[in-house]
Amino acid sequence: MKPPFDIAGDLDTPVSAFAKLASLRPRFLLESVEGGERQGRYSFIGFGDALEVKLDAHAFQIGDQRRAVPKDAHELLQGLRDALRLAPRPEPSVAQVPLAGGLVGYTSYDIVRYFEKLPSIAAPLPNAPPLLHYTAPRSLLVFDHSTRAIALLHAGSESDRAALRRAVVDALRGPAPSTLNARGQYTPPVAALSREDFIRGVGRTKEYIAAGDVYQLVLSSRFSGRHQLDPFQVYRALRLVNPSPYMFYCQLGELTVVG
């Protein structure tokens, strides 16, 4: 078998590669800048067919299996264990690489209600996102920034991997899409809490801390707005303005998660 890092990566960044691989259905991009200036050694692009795992108010979806909403934490964790068991295992495994497949996505804070008895004070949000949503793609590109080389990991036969490698190389040789620099419109985001309500919340938080009820409380507010922007452009802007450890861009069905 050829060495895993057998694709030249000196002409592309993970961002340009993600854009060029549009026809291969990229699912996520994971990058990292450490210390505010030093790029992490590895970046990752997951793409192609994938196992989707989603829990919302109606069902617990694990691939083709549509299960009932878990009644308790035990059922929830058992479902996640099943998802990990069913997740594709891209190969070859590379010892030093920190990610070689698995579930990539998010779990919302409200999942805590499976583990703690909490009152339901706030009204349900319209069009609320799933409680959790993960994707586990069959194919993974690993960028090694120290050697300027790329590895293709794939859950399939070696002949399938070879054919996919050719498709990846052909895509990377092509131009970046013209939409990569397209501009869009947006309305300024609006906070769900007014300034006055937020200040009152800060005051109550201080009272809870002084009374010993809590030792830490993160008061937050949801912001929402309308836009006609490509979510990937939002990620690019965030990446330029605030390069950070653990940057992510995830396409999860109709939902895109950026941070």
Which residue stretches match the model-derived regions?
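Extended alpha-helical targeting/anchoring segments
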Residues: 1-259
